[in-house]
Regions:
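Short conserved micro-motifs on helix faces and helix-strand junctions that flank
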Residues: 11, 86, 141, 186, ...
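Hydrophobic/aromatic residues in well-formed alpha-helices
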Residues: 1, 93, 107-110, 193, ...
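Active-site-proximal helix-loop-helix substrate-binding element of RNase H-like nuclease domains
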Residues: 21, 25, 29-160, 168-172
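Structured helix-beta-strand junction loops
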Residues: 7-9, 60-61, 214
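N-terminal accessory regions of nucleic-acid-interacting proteins
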Residues: 1-15
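Short beta-turn/strand-loop junction motif enriched in small, turn-promoting residues
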Residues: 16-20
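Conserved "right-hand" nucleotidyltransferase catalytic core of DNA-directed polymerases
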Residues: 151-259
Length: 259
């Protein structure tokens, strides 16, 4: 079955993991789909050499169609796996096309929106660490790659129609770097951070004391109490959000609240 994937032009790729942290959790299943072969599920617990087995596929020039590719790539990079070829991220494509609209971009949302199919996600949070997976889990995992290529076809046409292919390519090309950056993280001086947080806490306490001295014993985190207390000292406001308070920032007590 795997040999047919090595000559495919496009491959749907997904993984099921035991959790969300590539440093602590493991890949349990890898799922593949293509136009000309049945979906392929690879049990990483049962096949110890799955990385070597799939290396030719990872290195192939086939377009890798992945939903939220950054997640998969972080797990792969942690294991020393480099994915070659173009990545088409269905989640990023959907987000680009929906810019300005309050739409959801989970895989099930896209499948329903573009393919009019409702996915069963009941196994999404099930136990993927058990030695024997249930048939319902395997069906769920297969379903996750079943619709990637049909989505790719729909989204690619939408991107072309909206003249967004170049910006989409730019987004897809950055996924590798973003995944590597998030996986690597950055160094942090914990001692200096703790010192800074203590300074902020002291400043916050000082400002709160000054506000209470001006307005009386109130909960400064309560917009209702704050508005009433300001009214009592002659400061009439429509609300206590930052936009309204900024209009009166010249007043010392309001300045302290903003700080």
């Amino acid at each position: 079955k795997l040999s047919s994937y090595l000559t495919a032009d496009e491959i749907g790729l997904d993984i099921e993991t035991t959790g969300l942290d590539p440093y602590k959790d493991q890949i349990r299943l890898l799922q593949l789909s293509s136009r000309d072969a049945p979906n392929l599920l690879i049990d990483a617990y049962a096949i110890n050499n799955w990385i070597d087995l799939l290396k030719p596929l990872f290195k192939s020039s086939a377009i890798k169609i992945i939903h939220n590719a950054k997640f998969e790539l972080k797990f792969f990079y942690h294991l020393g796996i480099d994915i070659k070829g173009v990545i088409f991220d269905t989640m990023l494509a959907s987000q680009l096309l929906a810019a300005g609209y309050q739409l959801k971009h989970k895989l099930s949302d896209l499948v329903e929106r573009y393919l009019s199919i409702e996915m069963d996600k009941s196994e999404q949070k099930s136990d993927w660490n058990q030695l024997e997976l249930r048939s319902s889990q395997l069906a769920y995992a297969s379903n996750d790659v079943e619709y990637l290529i049909p989505l790719y076809d729909k989204l690619r046409l939408e991107l072309r129609h909206n003249k967004m292919r170049k910006v989409a390519k730019l987004e897809f090309d950055t996924v590798h770097a973003v995944a590597q950056m998030e996986l690597a993280g950055f160094g942090l001086d914990r001692q200096r951070l703790d010192q800074y947080l203590n300074q902020l806490a002291a400043k916050h306490q000082k400002l709160e004391t000054e506000i209470i001295n001006k307005l009386g014993p109130i909960n400064v985190n309560s917009p209702k109490q704050l508005k009433e207390a300001l009214f009592k000292v002659g400061i009439i406001l429509d609300g206590t959000n930052r936009e309204v308070l900024n209009q009166h920032a010249e007043l010392p007590v309001v300045f302290n609240i903003l700080e």
